[in-house]
């Protein structure tokens, strides 16, 4: 029976694929972005096949030359993609056969599209992770340097978005940096599990050809071949893991975004973003909108959605490969694009943030931010903490009635609540004294912030060297 489908798999079919079904099942519109990695995998596969004697040297050379020419065509925008050929693999193989004849049909020996696509995605994701890694390092560096610059800048620290205790702006920035440092570790761990090669697993059970998977793994830079052929072609947990990393990263970046949006508002007025990172209003001439952090905050939700989509995609699939897995690429690609874009935007923007130190300081003076310092003072004077808590609460109540901060009260006003209060109390009620007193590792004292920034610099430098 002749092939009536014009497909590589059409031998057992008696009629062509329905035109709508062909379009519905095709993936070339989105998986074509894998062409470079598909060609890399094919070059390694052909090289291995020649070394084990499945291909001749002339056949290998013809395949490698043909693949190189095809890559140039795609790069130049002259390659014609066909939906009828389903996917990136068959488009490239069909063009290779056009160029070099029957030898092109030998390339797929000992290989299935199942292990081919799993390999392509891992190659693509590995390269993309390296881009994300570099941008994340750049963002962290920007935060570290800004924190060192603002080590002495005092601002209110918040709980429940209510003034809690004074901190330094540098300390706050380093909190963000610590979150991103853990994200960086998660990314590096994810890359280790991405860097395992499925190629050679074939459809699901391996192949009868005398392949050497260690050769292809070495040529493609993989740490090792996958141990189990069924697992190699059927699971996408590595993509899910990247989606989980991306979700945690953007959760952190969304929290940063929320604060940046608040801080640029007239109600806070803590920072200024350069005009190049903001936009205006079509109707309100005065507006300067913090679009970059707002968009990062908004894009976080779509990355969460992609993670849930990938988890749901995989949850009920029997081994091994199923067509469901075609749906893994669009959410993964969009997650990658989104993460790379968000990181680049923030890495460019963060070093240009301008702190409005006077506004931050004045805000920290409101809300009785040194109340805990007064309680600690009383404890050091021998008052039990719970009693000290009650005493300071009464002092705060007076301040609310009189519209005075604790530091603005007279000694007599303070001593009406406790005889343990002396002249030296005012040293702990200043904002400068409050932050300076927290002079330990992890504390907000300016010297500790500078030391923490240096440790963060050193850790980031080590991480970059390990890449």
Swiss-Prot record:
Enzyme nomenclature, EC number: 4.3.2.1
Membrane-spanning intervals of the chain: none
Keyword line: Amino-acid biosynthesis, Arginine biosynthesis, Cytoplasm, Lyase
Database matches in PROSITE patterns: FUMARATE_LYASES
Matches recorded under InterPro entries: Arg_succ_lyase_C, Argininosuccinate_lyase, Fumarase/histidase_N, Fumarate_lyase_CS, Fumarate_lyase_fam, Fumarate_lyase_N, L-Aspartase-like
GO molecular function, one term: argininosuccinate lyase activity
Family annotation (Gene3D superfamilies): Fumarase/aspartase (C-terminal domain), Fumarase/aspartase (Central domain), Fumarase/aspartase (N-terminal domain)
GO biological process assignments: arginine biosynthetic process via ornithine; L-arginine biosynthetic process
Keyword Lyase: yes
Subcellular location: Cytoplasm
UniProt pathway: Amino-acid biosynthesis; L-arginine biosynthesis; L-arginine from L-ornithine and carbamoyl phosphate: step 3/3
Domain of life assignment: Bacteria
GO cellular component: cytosol
Keyword Nucleotide-binding: no
Reaction(s) catalysed (UniProt annotation): 2-(N(omega)-L-arginino)succinate = fumarate + L-arginine
PANTHER family: ARGININOSUCCINATE LYASE (PTHR43814:SF1)
NCBIfam families the record matches: argH
Family: Belongs to the lyase 1 family. Argininosuccinate lyase subfamily.
UniProt protein name: Argininosuccinate lyase
Gene transcribed to yield this protein: argH
